[in-house]
């Protein structure tokens, strides 16, 4: 991920700490009346189809992509010191820091998706990802 002030830069790009809506995370536009006060999707009988539309991050199999090993990264994601041609540093995080609104799910032997724990407002999910910024450490 790109670096800013010694930590991963936050944003909506494959090179940033975050997700690209509709690419990395499934989203839907739903009336705000379908969300509770904490911006989580209400159970269907409690949803009110009223209010402005808001983007929600759908809890499914998608999320922010993370590799479990340097070796499994494509060359364009690895900096030269790791045998690649990528321009951004590599970062790591203790999986114990992925808590609250986030869940780290290993979906292959070499890959993890950091997903929303439940369906929630996209803004809430993106804020939860951004709040992990201080826990990421550069890999040298």
What residue spans do the PLM features occupy?
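NAD-dependent ADP-ribosyltransferases
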Residues: 1-140
């Amino acid at each position: 991920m790109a670096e800013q002030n010694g930590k991963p830069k936050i944003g909506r790009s494959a090179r940033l700490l975050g997700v690209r809506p509709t690419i990395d995370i499934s989203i839907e536009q739903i009336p705000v009346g379908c969300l509770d006060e904490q911006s989580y999707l209400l159970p269907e009988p409690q949803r009110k189809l009223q209010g402005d539309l808001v983007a929600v991050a759908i809890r499914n199999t998608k999320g922010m992509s993370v590799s479990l090993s340097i070796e499994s990264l494509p060359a364009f994601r690895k900096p030269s010191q790791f045998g690649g041609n990528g321009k951004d540093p590599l970062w790591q995080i203790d999986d114990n820091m992925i808590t609250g609104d986030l869940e780290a799910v290993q979906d292959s032997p070499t890959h993890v998706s950091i997903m929303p724990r439940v369906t929630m407002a996209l803004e809430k999910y993106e804020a939860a990802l951004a709040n992990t910024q201080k826990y990421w450490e550069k890999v040298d």
